[in-house]
């Protein structure tokens, strides 16, 4: 097994883990329909920034 040469202090351990957290995805709300979608992506019904950009199956 590997053995550490020097013990890492709690402060250094915390600084090492500072970037290990998860971030929630940034959601945007479509102005025309009120649906939530990922930013810079179209909504499930084909709208992007208030305009219909993709035809859906129901149309």
From Swiss-Prot:
SUPFAM superfamilies, A to Z: Zn-binding ribosomal proteins (SSF57829)
GO molecular function, one term: structural constituent of ribosome
Record-level GO cellular component terms: large ribosomal subunit
GO BP term (any one): translation
Keyword annotations of the record: Ribonucleoprotein, Ribosomal protein
Record carries keyword DNA-binding: no
Pfam families: Ribosomal_L32p
Stated family: Belongs to the bacterial ribosomal protein bL32 family.
Name of this chain's protein: Large ribosomal subunit protein bL32
């Amino acid at each position: 097994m590997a053995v550490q040469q020097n013990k890492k202090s709690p402060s250094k351990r915390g600084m090492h883990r500072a970037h290990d957290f998860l971030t929630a995805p940034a959601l945007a709300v479509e102005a025309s329909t009120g649906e939530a979608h990922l930013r810079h992506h179209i909504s499930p019904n084909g709208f992007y920034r208030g305009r219909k950009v993709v035809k859906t199956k129901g149309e």
